[in-house]
Amino acid sequence: MNVYYEQDADLGYLQGKNIAVLGYGSQGHAHALNLKESGLNVCVGLRPESASCAKAREAGLEVNTVAEATKWADIVMVLLPDQNQKAVYDAEIAPNLVAGNTLAFGHGFNIHYKQIIPAESINVIMIAPKSPGHLVRRTFTEGNGVPCLIAVHQDATGEAKQQALAWAKALGGTKAGVIETSIKNETETDLFGEQAVLCGGSAELIKAGFETLVEAGYPEELAYFECMHELKLIVDLYYEGGLSRMNYSVSDTAEYGGMTRGPRLITPAVKAEMKKILEEVQDGRFAKEFIDECNGGYKNLNKLREENSGHAIEKVGAKLRDMMSWLIKK
């Protein structure tokens, strides 16, 4: 696996080019501002009615429609929600691309699952910071950066990889390390991680633990602290030094209990289900299901959102978080 740093990337591959960042959400604002402050010529492409137009202009960025920004640009970074990209690409991006342009993405979903199929005369690259946008922005302003993944899907000009590395450098990523991968590997591992561990697995584990304690007669407040609130303390230890750092930092009681009881929860049957989830990502079944869900008006997703928001852990959690003066209230 190739890892690149400051000396491996040259901003010259982006200097003098017009760069459009489509979208101004979590990642979009970080990409646009970091590239602008790296001395590059950037504009933001948004719907005219978007509330983000005013925010981008207030930050000193030029704002145009998606079509206008694409037509003006040599390099176009698509940072719109996955489910919106195909329609916007077909209507406003593709008609305004010309041979030799570069089309960039922050995630490979639409390229990998062939929702978007660019012309062969276009460079297609991916630059994916492995952090939320606010952290991409904050570390840049502090003179640092976050690790990034890059991939080249199509190299029409012979400069696609150099452009991807230069973009990662302009984000600050080469100060932390830039890993070269493929669209396929980024997409499939990202989706699996979200579903089986980060967003799906962890949420269900938290709820099951909370419910087990409450059903046994313990106060909801204690159940919340033990199964939700304190999870951050453990994850921070993982983040800083891996599993060993966590085991070293907790009590012997916690370490022994975790090592002997944890495998009783995450059994071979659970791992077998993980493999099924991965297969659904790999063969496109999840992508088709998600696209159909979006096209159908999010009926199942909205139902699931309502069920989750009504869970007891959400209600007691909101009450307890109001008592935590150190939390930034939003």
UniProtKB/Swiss-Prot annotation:
InterPro entries: 6-PGluconate_DH-like_C_sf (IPR008927), KARI (IPR013023), KARI_C (IPR000506), KARI_N (IPR013116), KARI_prok (IPR014359), NAD(P)-bd_dom_sf (IPR036291). NADP(+) binds at residues 24-27, 47, 50, 52, 82-85, 133. Keywords: Amino-acid biosynthesis, Branched-chain amino acid biosynthesis, Magnesium, Metal-binding, NADP, Oxidoreductase. Residues 1-181 form the KARI N-terminal Rossmann domain. Binds 2 magnesium ions per subunit. One of its GO terms (molecular function) is magnesium ion binding. The active site is at residue 107. It comes from the Bacteria. GO terms for biological process: isoleucine biosynthetic process; L-valine biosynthetic process. Mg(2+) 1 binds at residues 190, 194. It is an enzyme of class 1 (oxidoreductase). Residues 182-327 form the KARI C-terminal knotted domain. GO terms for cellular component: cytosol. Pathway: Amino-acid biosynthesis; L-isoleucine biosynthesis; L-isoleucine from 2-oxobutanoate: step 2/4; Amino-acid biosynthesis; L-valine biosynthesis; L-valine from pyruvate: step 2/4. It catalyses: (2R)-2,3-dihydroxy-3-methylbutanoate + NADP(+) = (2S)-2-acetolactate + NADPH + H(+); (2R,3R)-2,3-dihydroxy-3-methylpentanoate + NADP(+) = (S)-2-ethyl-2-hydroxy-3-oxobutanoate + NADPH + H(+). Its EC number is 1.1.1.86. Mg(2+) 2 binds at residues 190, 226, 230. Gene3D superfamilies: 6.10.240.10, NAD(P)-binding Rossmann-like Domain. Involved in the biosynthesis of branched-chain amino acids (BCAA). Catalyzes an alkyl-migration followed by a ketol-acid reduction of (S)-2-acetolactate (S2AL) to yield (R)-2,3-dihydroxy-isovalerate. In the isomerase reaction, S2AL is rearranged via a Mg-dependent methyl migration to produce 3-hydroxy-3-methyl-2-ketobutyrate (HMKB). In the reductase reaction, this 2-ketoacid undergoes a metal-dependent reduction by NADPH to yield (R)-2,3-dihydroxy-isovalerate. This is Ketol-acid reductoisomerase (NADP(+)). It comes from Pelodictyon phaeoclathratiforme (strain DSM 5477 / BU-1).
